[in-house]
Amino acid sequence: VVLSHLVAFYGIKLAPEPDYPPPKNSEWAWLVTGYSECIDSFFAFGLFALAKQSGFFPAELVETFEPVIQEEARHILFFANWVAWHRRNLSWWRRIAFEARVLGVWAFLIWERIGIARGIDADGEVQDANFAMTGGSAVTGDDLSPRLLIELCLGENERRMAGYDRRLLRPTTVPFLARIARRLLGRPKAPTTGTGEMR
């Protein structure tokens, strides 16, 4: 509803939504949707905080979108707990097949994200679609290092998940991969002035 009002207010012309036929494999489609949302929400948390801190979003817009962002947190929280519940109710041999399917989903999503980062759409056309980095730079007006973006997203993810019942499982795969990426990126060198003092 919020997005539809913004689109209407600014007169943005959008292509009509195509028909979405039922998926041939509902479990695969559900897993792709759920894990994809875990990835997107993780970065959305950080970018939203960045927009808020930088003043790129006015207070009224932050207030409008805050419930939307928090709803994303509830979505991925629900998905993580559904996956755990589903695993527990599978027989051992069905669980093996399920884990193989989950690995296949992650392989598909990683490949898809590589294409997005390179700016290539589903039709093979080159696009400026590296949203996490270009979006972050657009918000701050400066180049945003991958490490700083990851640290911000990790902090915001922990903050948003902290308010829920501790008995609920949290999504862990994306934060785990983000911490590995942060370690591989190494610590940034602190800039110094001519006097040796940190800026």
Model-found features: residue ranges?
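Non-heme di-metal
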Residues: 1-199
